[in-house]
Design a protein with these regions (language model features):
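Flexible, glycine-rich phosphate/dinucleotide-binding loops
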Residues: 132, 218, 234, 242-243
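ABC-family P-loop ATPase nucleotide-binding domain
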Residues: 1-29, 235, 239-250
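H-loop (His-switch) and adjacent beta-strand-loop-beta switch element
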Residues: 225-238
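ABC family nucleotide-binding domain
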Residues: 19-21, 26-228
Length: 250
């Protein structure tokens, strides 16, 4: 297990051979006996390094569960998940903590900002988790937070709070950013603004991203669109260029 973490560290600043994220025949169930429900059913997908991948599907299709198992927040019943050359399914509890701390960033629907810290301080606290964080001022400027850096979360709009949450996730230079419905609590105009910001971050910093969303507006921004139904991938479309309208109508 220690070797798996070591391989992650060796790959942190270099290209990874093959897919950066590889999910192979993953199954995941919840409950026991007659109440047992299979949420992921032999699900497989691959995401290249630096790619922005959208995960679309109806509520209950398994999208959030997929992020949870890729992020090491939940165990699989069977199958294998590799991220950056690291076999996540082979990691023990302490190694999973290292994996989440050192290699992943998380952005959720609700921002979970520390209310008595300013925007700058919220970001700074997370930067301490990395030995080589991004330049905080550059990140604040890139995410359009310069005018709000010394404000508290209660003084921000929903979109501004989500920008702060994204900056906080990015400052420690994660290899993989996992976003679970990052625009779910926002109005349609702000949602498109945040999705465009995630695309900008992806292009600027080369961060590999998995974004779970109901928002079809993201599809034109993505390198790959994966659609999930009843716990399985029903379609996956993508290439080296942004997707055209005809490509995303599946």
């Amino acid at each position: 297990m220690r070797d798996a973490i070591k391989r992650c560290r060796q790959n942190q600043d270099g290209a990874v051979r093959g897919p950066f994220v590889s999910v192979q025949d993953v199954c995941k169930s919840y409950g026991l006996g007659e109440g047992k429900a299979q949420v992921l059913k032999d699900l497989s997908l691959e995401v290249a390094q630096g790619e922005l991948c959208a995960i679309l599907g109806a509520s209950g299709s398994g999208k959030s569960t997929l992020l949870n198992v890729v992020g090491g927040l939940d165990e699989v019943d069977s199958g294998r998940i590799c991220v950056g050359g690291c076999d996540v399914t082979a990691l023990g509890p302490s190694q999973l903590l290292e994996y989440r701390r050192d290699f992943l960033g998380f952005v959720f629907q609700f921002y979970n900002l520390v209310p008595n810290l300013t925007v700058r301080e919220n970001i700074q606290v997370t930067s301490y988790l990395s030995a080589n964080p991004l330049d905080m001022q550059e990140l604040i400027e890139t995410l359009g937070l310069s005018a709000h850096a010394d404000k508290f979360p209660s003084q921000l709009s929903g979109g501004q709070q989500q920008r702060c949450a994204i900056a906080r996730a990015l400052v420690k230079k994660p290899q993989l950013l996992l976003c679970d419905e990052p625009t779910g609590a926002l109005d349609s105009a702000t949602s498109l603004e945040i999705l465009g910001l995630l695309e900008q971050v992806n292009r600027s910093f080369g961060t590999t991203m998995l974004i779970v969303t109901h928002n079809e507006g993201i599809t034109a921004m993505c390198d790959q669109v994966v659609r999930i139904k009843d716990g399985s991938v029903v379609s996956s479309v993508g290439n080296a260029h942004k997707l055209s309208a005809s490509e995303i109508e599946l």
